[in-house]
UniProtKB/Swiss-Prot annotation:
Reported phenotype of the disruption mutant: Deficient mice exhibit significant differences in lactate concentration and pH in the retina and display reduced visual function.
SUPFAM superfamilies listed in its UniProt record: MFS general substrate transporter
Biased composition (Basic and acidic residues): 476-492
Cytoplasmic side: 1-14, 80-85, 137-146, 194-228, 279-293, 340-352, 408-492
Highest taxon of source: Eukaryota
Signal peptide: none
Record localization: Basolateral cell membrane
Species in which this protein is naturally found: Mus musculus
Keywords in alphabetical order: Cell membrane, Membrane, Symport, Transmembrane, Transmembrane helix, Transport
Span list, region Basolateral sorting signal: 426-460, 461-482
Described purpose of this protein according to its UniProt entry: Probable retinal pigment epithelium (RPE)-specific proton-coupled L-lactate transporter. May facilitate transport of lactate and H(+) out of the retina and could therefore play an essential role in maintenance of metabolic and ionic homeostasis of the outer retina.
Protein name: Monocarboxylate transporter 3
Length: 492
């Protein structure tokens, strides 16, 4: 079709090769979230060989997680500059090299630099591009795709931890690290299938040699002026302060309540099993026509349910009540995991998603470095898990309430502004708005600053005919900034 044809030919295919991309995203998400926790099964041997304490060896996983979250902006810049596939291939090699080099480490600091920094950076360079490509391939089925991809985290965690235990018993921690390094080469295979989706050819940059406009697009910090994005960032910060604390302390909390060791460890398996079921189920539910426009409120409900679960279960002492807590916690935790990136994609749109995701992960890294360590120190000081559950539950519940209230206020404000302009401006207002958009250095989105309003119209194909040309420009931006380098190579 010509350039002025319908958007349907240029939009996300919602299937086809997208299912292969979804499978790769499932694997990458599993490695990114499951690997730092799976490495902890080697800590006992590391303590013995290096004569270190638990807190010293635990820094390996902490550094890995800090790199996964904290290098988000760097990953965004690299994806925009080189495309998703090259970044993921390089990330897979880095992650594998980090674990292989770690198997030859003779000091803990060498483990920090190899398994912590190199492997963490490699996982980050795989995780973020995979989510970006998922958003380019799915639109109508995007909630379901996000839910299925997010299920990789509990699935891989339930597989990698027993595998690490087995490898450690048979080959020692050095052999286990070496084999884990080989396992991480699967990230390269996942990166190889990340070809850009079919669509119109990328537009040429009007400025010579890339110029200032090109450099500006490497990381779109202007997204921080979008009040909808600010709402999401504050919500994620509050959420990350307390969301992971109960899962980290659950086993020790159960042992403190008199539960035997084997039964206490089984509680995490219950959380994992419910989480595996909840993520794709919630993704399918969020994709329903009547619910999809209200995904931010569904996300808020999941956060509120998770926080209330922590608050209600803070005084649970019997094994039966702890099992009930694990079921409720796993369900709400899975809902949060399935919806968090869907809300961000719907809020900022595909062109700004790489930059937005990088900035969100950076903010989340700060919260993760504050929340769980502070909870551990409070437990050591107070010898009381109940207060920790109250604090964690309050933070997550507050995040849910904040998200719901501010989303409602933003939508009302946007509707009032739009109705006021249509009543006063007449026919000249659209021209003024278009002129303002043309004067901006980089087109960021077709929505007004309060882009939460876009969540009420999530199906572009149902829009009015007058909006078709604007909608058609979005995939072109995607291909230019994310997959343009790969698309040019294929065309050549």
């Amino acid at each position: 079709m010509g350039a002025g044809g319908p958007r349907r030919g240029a939009g996300p295919p919602d299937g086809g090769w997208g299912w292969v991309v979804l499978g790769a995203c499932f694997v990458v998400t599993g490695f990114a979230y499951g690997f730092p926790k799976a490495v902890s099964v080697f800590f006992r041997e590391l303590k013995r060989d290096f004569g270190a304490g638990y807190s010293d060896t635990a820094w390996v996983s902490s550094i890995m997680l800090a790199m996964l979250y904290g290098t988000g902006p760097l990953s965004s810049i690299l994806v925009t500059r080189f495309g998703c596939r090259p970044v993921m291939l390089a990330g897979g090699l880095l992650a594998s090299a980090g674990m292989i080099l770690a198997s030859f480490a003779s000091r803990l600091v060498e483990l920090y630099l190899t398994a912590g920094v190199l492997t963490g950076l490699g996982l980050a360079l795989n995780f973020q591009p995979s989510l970006i490509m998922l958003g380019l391939y799915f639109e109508r089925r995007r909630p379901l795709a996000n839910g299925l991809a997010a299920a990789g985290s509990p699935v891989f965690l339930s597989m990698l931890s027993p595998l690490g235990q087995l490898l450690g018993e048979r080959f020692g921690w050095r052999g286990g690290f070496l084999l884990f390094g080989g396992l991480l080469l699967h990230c390269c295979a996942c990166g190889a299938v990340m070809r850009p989706p079919p669509g119109p050819p990328p537009r040429r940059d009007p400025s010579p040699h890339g110029g200032p406009a090109r450099r500006r697009r490497l990381l779109d910090v202007a997204v921080c002026t979008d009040r909808a994005f600010v709402v999401y960032v504050v919500t994620k910060f509050l959420m990350a302060l307390g969301l992971f604390v109960p899962a980290i302390l659950l086993v020790n909390y159960a042992k403190d309540a008199g539960v035997p060791d084997a039964e206490a460890a089984f509680l995490l398996s219950i959380v994992g099993f419910v989480d595996i079921v909840a993520r794709p189920a919630c993704g399918a539910l969020a994709g329903l026509g009547r619910l999809r426009p209200h995904v931010p409120y569904l996300f808020s409900l999941a956060l509120l349910a998770n926080g209330l679960t922590d608050l209600i279960s803070a005084r649970a002492r019997s094994y039966g009540t702890l099992v009930a807590f694990c079921i409720a916690f796993g369900l709400s935790y899975g809902m949060v995991g399935a919806l968090q990136f869907e809300v961000l994609m719907a809020t900022v749109g595909a062109p700004r998603f790489p930059s937005a995701l990088g900035l969100v992960l950076l903010v989340e890294a700060v919260a993760v470095l504050i929340g769980p360590p502070s909870a551990g120190r409070l437990v050591d000081a107070l010898k009381n898990y109940e207060i920790i559950f109250y604090l964690a539950g309050s933070e997550v519940a507050l995040a849910g309430v904040f998200m719901a209230v501010t989303t409602y206020c933003c939508l009302r404000c946007s509707k009032n502004i739009s109705s006021g302009r249509s009543a006063e401006g007449g026919a000249s207002d659209p021209e003024d708005v278009e002129a303002e958009r043309d004067s901006e250095p980089m087109p960021a989105s077709t929505e007004e600053p309060g882009s939460l309003e876009a969540l009420e119209v999530l199906s572009p194909r149902a829009g009015s005919p007058e909006q078709e040309p604007e909608e058609e420009a979005v995939p072109e931006l995607d291909h230019e900034s994310i997959g343009g380098h790969e698309a040019r190579g294929q065309k050549a």
